[in-house]
């Protein structure tokens, strides 16, 4: 009876050793950085891996293969990636990426790396000069079959019960249509870092793509239509503009029931205009810069460009969910328009697609949207955007310290009148029937620039949609107001306080 129990104990001991090694074995990796001079690091050597207790550690390698010549890019430690679990060898499987990437578990396992395409293409291997086997190597290979098999079974059961893969394998072959080509799609690794926002259609992560930070908007499978719509807007010719969010890639990640739909875009650390105004009071010049670049972005989005920089025809596009949460800020407070999931294109001879009337964020809905009386024509949708722009401009003015008076805590439009979570009926009563708008404070009107800007705001949110300004007109006005105020001396400012008509604003005829 003792022999079977001894064998079982021996098996269990090797199992425990193998299990322990699976998560703790990777302590050091081969290090290499081709850009060591620019990044001011060592070129090569060994890297000691450090991470959180519940995270697994791996080694990775990335390289280029130009006509059979292997060019190393980077090697080093990599943190807790599901694709690296239980891989003793560093093997890349992508067909033809611009940069090959592989990861593995085990000390120095990235010393040797291999490209082995899943389709069965030729194997390309980089192998360092051979070294004589050591006793430790012989022992490791002797225990590897038993320990490895046991570890795989345990890990498979544990992962099934406790977690799903944090970063799935790229799977774009079932895509409903080809994403626009992007030079960064093939670059690896991409690692999710932290959730920055949650919205109607999913969450937005800050992620790292090689040496750059990017934003990853993750849609659940049930919101596939929104992901597809936003991807199609981004793929429209002429969508590259300094005041529109930069698109990088669209991908499917995972498989079967674990599929997630990713949109990868530029990352802006200051976040949305809403978040920035909550925590910051802005100056007059900052207000003008945000307002001018924001209106420039919306003006370009609305514009129909017959031949845009050789890319083809850029149609007029209505945003349909314009709000301060969907305006991002660059490091210099330049505004960038984002979230085109509800946007609609107006192409000659083609229907504009889904033009359901009551879409967007309820608080920012124009009167005609709230009462369901929309004219389903291009100009009607652009004017709806302009009503929302008036509300966002009001948010900017409400947090500006230029006027001689108190700056209140940040509040959303109509929050003072009907609270943070208004119903559709409450908004209809206030906006449509009572024709109320957010309050314009008396002390704002004593500042020459803010007073003129308030006139522009009122012409953006006019109850009569046809009387509203265009985005291009708002851009012109803000630029003119800024120059007129900044170009005056303090003596002139005193005289301007009593009259805000000293500067001729662009006429309403420049509206849509």
Curated annotation (Swiss-Prot):
Keywords: ATP-binding, Cell membrane, Disulfide bond, Glycoprotein, Kinase, Magnesium, Manganese, Membrane, Metal-binding, Nucleotide-binding, Phosphoprotein, Receptor, Serine/threonine-protein kinase, Signal, Transferase, Transmembrane, Transmembrane helix. Its EC number is 2.7.11.30. It is a single-pass type I membrane protein. Coiled coil: none annotated. It is found in: Cell membrane. Pfam families: Activin_recp (PF01064), Pkinase (PF00069). GO terms for molecular function: activin binding; activin receptor activity; ATP binding; metal ion binding. Residues 1-18 form the signal peptide. Residues 491-512 are annotated as: Interaction with DYNLT1. Disulfide bonds join 29-59, 49-77, 84-103, 90-102, 104-109. Gene3D superfamilies: CD59, Phosphorylase Kinase, domain 1, Transferase(Phosphotransferase) domain 1. It catalyses: L-threonyl-[receptor-protein] + ATP = O-phospho-L-threonyl-[receptor-protein] + ADP + H(+); L-seryl-[receptor-protein] + ATP = O-phospho-L-seryl-[receptor-protein] + ADP + H(+). Residues 190-480 form the Protein kinase domain. ATP binds at residues 196-204, 217. The active site is at residue 321. PANTHER family: ACTIVIN RECEPTOR TYPE-2B (PTHR23255:SF70), TRANSFORMING GROWTH FACTOR-BETA RECEPTOR TYPE I AND II (PTHR23255). Belongs to the protein kinase superfamily. TKL Ser/Thr protein kinase family. TGFB receptor subfamily. Transmembrane serine/threonine kinase activin type-2 receptor forming an activin receptor complex with activin type-1 serine/threonine kinase receptors (ACVR1, ACVR1B or ACVR1c). Transduces the activin signal from the cell surface to the cytoplasm and is thus regulating many physiological and pathological processes including neuronal differentiation and neuronal survival, hair follicle development and cycling, FSH production by the pituitary gland, wound healing, extracellular matrix production, immunosuppression and carcinogenesis. Forms an activin receptor complex with activin type II receptors such as ACVR1B. Interacts with VPS39. Interacts with DYNLT1. This is Activin receptor type-2B.
């Amino acid at each position: 009876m003792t022999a079977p129990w001894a064998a079982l104990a021996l098996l269990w001991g090797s199992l425990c050793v193998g299990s322990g090694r699976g998560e703790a074995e990777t302590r050091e990796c081969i290090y290499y950085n081709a850009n060591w001079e620019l990044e001011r690091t060592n070129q090569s050597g060994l890297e000691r891996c450090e991470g959180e207790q519940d995270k697994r550690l791996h080694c990775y390698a990335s390289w280029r293969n130009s006509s059979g010549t292997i060019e190393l890019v980077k090697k080093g430690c990599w943190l807790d990636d599901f694709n690296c679990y239980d891989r003793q060898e560093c093997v890349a499987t992508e067909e033809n990426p611009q940069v090959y990437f592989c990861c593995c578990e085990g000390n120095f396992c990235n010393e040797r790396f291999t490209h082995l395409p899943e389709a069965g293409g030729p194997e390309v291997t980089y192998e360092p000069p051979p070294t004589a086997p050591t006793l430790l190597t012989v022992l490791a290979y002797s225990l590897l079959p038993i320990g490895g098999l046991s570890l795989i079974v345990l890990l498979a059961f544990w992962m099934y019960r406790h977690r799903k893969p944090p970063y799935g394998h790229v799977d774009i072959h079932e895509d409903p249509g080809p994403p626009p080509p992007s030079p960064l799609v093939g670059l690896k690794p991409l690692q999710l870092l932290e959730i920055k926002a949650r919205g109607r259609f999913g969450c937005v992560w800050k992620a790292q793509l090689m040496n750059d930070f990017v934003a990853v908007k993750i849609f659940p499978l049930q919101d596939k239509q929104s992901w597809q719509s936003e991807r199609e807007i981004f793929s429209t010719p002429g969508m590259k503009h300094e005041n529109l969010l930069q698109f990088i890639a669209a991908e499917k990640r995972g498989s079967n029931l674990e599929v997630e739909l990713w949109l990868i875009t530029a990352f802006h650390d200051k976040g949305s205009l809403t978040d920035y105004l909550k925590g910051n009071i802005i100056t007059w010049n900052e207000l003008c810069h945000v307002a001018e670049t924001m209106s420039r972005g919306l003006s370009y989005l609305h514009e129909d460009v017959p031949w845009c920089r050789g890319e083809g025809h850029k149609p007029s596009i209505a945003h349909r969910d314009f709000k301060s949460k969907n305006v991002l800020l660059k490091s210099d407070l330049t505004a960038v328009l984002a979230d085109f999931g509800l946007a609609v294109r107006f192409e000659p001879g083609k229907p504009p697609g889904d033009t359901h009337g009551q879409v967007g964020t309820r608080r920012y809905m124009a009167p005609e949207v709230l009462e369901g009386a929309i004219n389903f024509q291009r100009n009607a949708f652009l004017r709806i955007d302009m009503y929302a722009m008036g509300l966002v401009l009001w948010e900017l003015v409400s947090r500006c310290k230029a006027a001689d008076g108190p700056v209140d805590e940040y509040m959303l439009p109509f929050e003072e009148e009907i609270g943070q979570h208004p119903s559709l009926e409450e908004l209809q009563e206030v906006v449509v029937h009572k024709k109320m708008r957010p309050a314009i404070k008396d002390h704002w009107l004593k500042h020459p620039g803010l007073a003129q800007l308030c006139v522009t705001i009122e012409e953006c949110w006019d109850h009569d949609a046809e009387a509203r300004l265009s985005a291009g007109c708002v851009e012109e006005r803000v630029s003119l107001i800024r120059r007129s105020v900044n170009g005056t001396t303090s003596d002139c400012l005193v005289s301007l306080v009593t009259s805000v008509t000293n500067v001729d604003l662009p006429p309403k005829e420049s509206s849509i």
